[in-house]
Amino acid sequence: MSDGITGALRNAASVVAPDAIRRRFGAKFAVAFIVVLVVIAGAGVFAFQSTETTVEHQTTRQLAESNQLEADAIGAWMEQQRTHARSVSQDEALRDDRRAAPYILLKDQLLPADVVSMHLVNETRGTVVASTELAIEGRSLAELDAPWTTAAVPEGPGNDSAVWATEQSYRSPVLNDEPVMAFASSVPKREGAHLVVVTRIQPQVDRLSDANSTRRTTILNTGDEPVLDSNSRFDAGALTDSIAAVRNDTTAATTTVSNGRVYALSATPHTDWVTVTSVDTGEAFAVRDTVGQTVTVLVVLAVISLAIVGIALGRHTVTPLKRLRNRAQDIESGTFDVDLSTRRIDEVGRLYGSFDDMRVSLQDRIQEAEAAVEEANAAKAEAEELRTDAEDAQAEAERAKATAEAASERLQERAADYSEVMQAVADGDLTERLDEDADEEAMRAVATEFNAMLDGLEATIAQVAGFADEVADETLQVATGAEEIETTSQTVSERIQEIADGAIQQHDDLERAAGEMDELSASIQEVAASSATVAETAADAVERGEAGRDAAESAIDDMAEIESLSADAVDQILALQERMSDIGDIIEFITDIAEQTNMLALNANIEAARADKDGDGFAVVANEVKDLAEETKQAAADIESEIQAVQAETDETVADIRATSEHIDDGVSTVERAAAAIEDTVDAIEDANHGIQEISDATEDQADATQSVVRRVDDVADISQHVTEDAEQVSAAAEEQSASVAEIARSADDLRDRADALATTVNQFETRADADEPDADTTVDASADDTGD
């Protein structure tokens, strides 16, 4: 299978590659180098684009998830504040103005620290009936500058659970102009009354901003205005379509890039608000830029490394072989005056030296042959004198000439064979070898050195191929390990997510437990307050009993004085009765005057009628006098009736005083018995007071203990919240790690592909190891080459 593929690729390369490239090893090396460069650059561009897309997707997804978490947190906070307002407003204490003030003061201590103040508003009267802020209590709503003074709070059947909230935060003078929000809930069974709960939102504002980052979160109301910070400004013009899409589908979330920032939008639960989270693109895609730089550096390093290898191989192998091939062709054509000197001492240098020795040896043999021919000619001339000797000398000269010519032909044939072998080696066939079985020592040295150089070159190529295979194997192991790490990271992420879900459930349970503990604490504190009230009442009863005892003792003394005073009162009332008779006479006199005045007014009217128009003014005065007389007469009648009533009551009073005087003696004895009974009652109340004081102290201790439990439950709930947030952060980190491991795996795959490409390039050289291993992958005569000096 491998041989078939290799053969097919070789045939395809032979068809595609022109003969000019196939005949030159340097050209093939240059083409191979360019192909590898293109492959590496393409892989780098693909890796960068793939990584860029993945990182951008992960960044926007993480921003959207963070935006959704913040929206859920704001929605939960709003629902919690509505629950506070709704639960506090349902109590019966708010239906009585006298009980409302201590009730909201107590609730203010029990609710979380974010609650700034509470106000009971009577819309009918337009006043604040009770408030935790004494400066506001009793004031008119028109005098206050706060949004809740004009709140349209739903009330009536079916609206007891409805809670009104401000559309935007406002600055509270109570908190030094810190941002707050108000929540209002109607009081059941009390028309025109609702409770206002004012809550600080600075912790929410601080949580949504990070001074060390460009990331910002803004909550927009229905008018696209910031809710939590009314002083801030937000340009929602570029996000109009996205905001409308979120409002139309509250379950949808969207992301967009605009004005150099990445935006994530989602609906805020339990409200009609939109949560917008944004971050600068430079910060959001910093990882993408870093990965791009890393990929670029890897590609550049790979290109530089390949260039160094190509230059080294080309400069130290291809170029010397080309020069040596040209010198061998000169020698083959009969030009022996060629320069074969070199400063290299490796196999190539020794090969140059062997060729130079061969050139010198061949030149010496030719010179010897020419000298032999000259000697033969001289001998032939001398042989003319001695024919026999000359014939022998001539024969010997001819034999010497034949020997020299044969040696010259053998040298030329050997040089031609060596040239063919070197040409094959230059074409990439490293399995060829020079025949070392030569008669001439110089030729044997040339063959030996050249073959040694080819052995070294074969070893180098084999090492490079082995290194490429090892790199491929190692990258395969790295990719496998990266996949295992990615699987483990995903498992860890799932486990951490399960832990986060459990922590959220635990946090919810703790919040419910905290609410129940709050109610229990409130009940115990009410019992403690009632116990304290009873204790104070008992103590007051003791004091009043003691005062009653003292009063009873003094009452006995006062009875005698009352008895004497009652006699004096009878005398004074009798004198008063005589004065009343005198007043009656005066009233009769006033009545007579009024009747006479009335008669005068009547006469004046008669005269005015006679005077016609000239008497209009006189008639008016007469009418006024008449009216005054009538009023005087009526007043005199009223006074007379009152005097008669007073006289009747005076008579009754005289009778009562006399009867009272008779009962005073009986009262003295009764008061004495009551004083004794009060003494006994005071003692019993003192004993009861001691017991009630002990109960009050025990109840206060229980209330303090319950408050401590509530605080601890709140602390545990806060810890649970932190655990949940940390678990979510760890889960996000695990997902990022999984993504990074996936990138490592992809990079390892790219490296393995490049190693395979290098192995393919190296396998273009035919070596004896390939010939000895028929089952191994054979080389491919690809059109890939590298150049260098």
Curated annotation (Swiss-Prot):
HAMP domain boundaries: 315-367, 409-462
A single GO molecular function term of this UniProt record: transmembrane signaling receptor activity
Top-level division of the source organism's lineage: Archaea
UniProt-listed InterPro entries: Chemotax_Me-accpt_rcpt, HAMP_dom, MCPsignal_dom
Biological process annotations from GO: chemotaxis; signal transduction
Role description: Potentially involved in chemo- or phototactic signal transduction.
Cell inner membrane listed as a keyword: no
Descriptive protein name: Transducer protein Htr6
PTM comment: Methylated by CheR.
Protein family according to the UniProt entry: Belongs to the methyl-accepting chemotaxis (MCP) protein family.
Lineage: Archaea, Methanobacteriati, Methanobacteriota, Stenosarchaea group, Halobacteria
Keywords: Cell membrane, Chemotaxis, Membrane, Repeat, Transducer, Transmembrane, Transmembrane helix
Feature: compositional bias, Acidic residues: 772-789
Membrane topology label: Multi-pass membrane protein
All residue ranges annotated as the Methyl-accepting transducer domain in the record: 481-717
Originating organism: Halobacterium salinarum (strain ATCC 29341 / DSM 671 / R1)
Pfam families in the cross-refs: HAMP (PF00672), MCPsignal (PF00015)
Annotated localization: Cell membrane
GO cellular component terms given for this protein: plasma membrane
Renumbered residue ranges of the record's region Disordered: 763-789
Coiled coil (residue ranges): none
Main location as per UniProt: membrane
Chain segments annotated as transmembrane: 29-49, 294-314
